[in-house]
């Protein structure tokens, strides 16, 4: 019997690409399911003139998606796990975790530049990143940059910044790996909890067994470990807490 599944997603190009990855998996592995994507703009996508800790934290990226789940306008939500609050409502649990893409942060220079100079600030809003960058580049200054990845790259190429710090996973999923000037190893810059992993959120009590083979055990274990570590330290947008776990099972 055919079953319709609606997946909630933010409107940005990266968010839609990530959601389409999940949609393709379901359509390939569960051909009896009809899958649709419901895109929406979140509060975090709209408020761009202030840093996240000034306007309510990472919850601003999930509020509208959570409401769609609760109202049954959607059946799943796809998130970049690093952008999710460390505590999720009991009624809206994380039901699956993707295989982990590259968890590293990266340095991105303006087009045509091959070396980092410090005459302009590095575009970076994360306290986690800034604190670690101050060790790597003590002569650097920093300025807030908000917006989706493509908006940030445009601001960089327009001459507003000497460089950006972004997540490798997002650039790779956008097909923009060539923009990466330098990978920052975890020993240099510890990533955010869950970085590189997609978290799929559903409703408590519903049957999500169709995601069993999508769910990556190593990524799940690392994600839960990292998120628990940050929760214990009461870390959030205003706290420079980082966490990076490795699964030793297959090493």
Where is each model-derived feature located?
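Small-molecule-sensing regulatory modules
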Residues: 2-41, 46-47, 54, 130, ...
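Short, structured active-site "lid" loops
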Residues: 50-74
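Short beta-strand and adjacent tight-turn residues that come in two discontinuous sequence segments
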Residues: 61, 79, 165-167
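Short, Asp-centered acidic motifs that coordinate Mg2+ and/or phosphate
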Residues: 74-78, 162-163
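A conserved helix-loop-strand patch within extracytoplasmic ligand-binding domains
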Residues: 81-82, 90-139
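Short glycine-rich anion-binding loops that position phosphate/pyrophosphate groups of nucleotides
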Residues: 81-84, 169-171
């Amino acid at each position: 019997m055919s079953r319709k599944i609606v997946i909630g997603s933010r409107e940005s190009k990266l968010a839609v690409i990530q959601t389409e990855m999940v949609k393709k998996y379901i359509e390939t592995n569960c051909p009896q399911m009809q899958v649709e994507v419901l895109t929406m703009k979140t509060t975090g996508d709209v408020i761009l003139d202030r840093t996240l800790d000034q306007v309510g934290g990472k919850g601003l990226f999930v509020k509208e998606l959570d409401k769609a789940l609760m109202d049954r306008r959607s059946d799943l939500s796809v998130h970049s796990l690093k952008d999710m609050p460390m505590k999720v409502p009991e009624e809206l649990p994380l039901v699956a975790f993707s295989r982990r893409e590259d968890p590293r942060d990266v340095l991105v220079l303006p087009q045509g530049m091959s070396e980092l100079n410090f005459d302009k600030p590095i575009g970076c809003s994360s306290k986690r990143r800034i604190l670690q960058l101050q060790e790597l580049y003590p002569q650097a200054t920093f300025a807030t940059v908000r917006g989706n990845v493509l908006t940030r790259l445009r601001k960089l190429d327009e001459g507003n910044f000497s460089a950006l710090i972004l997540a490798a996973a997002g650039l790779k999923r956008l097909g923009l790996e060539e923009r990466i000037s330098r990978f920052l190893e975890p020993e240099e810059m510890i990533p955010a909890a869950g970085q590189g992993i997609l978290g799929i959120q559903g409703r408590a009590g519903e049957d999500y067994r169709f995601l069993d083979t999508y769910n990556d055990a190593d990524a799940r274990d690392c994600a839960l470990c990292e998120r628990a570590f940050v929760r214990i330290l009461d870390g959030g947008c205003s706290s420079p807490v980082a966490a990076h776990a490795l699964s030793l099972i297959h090493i």
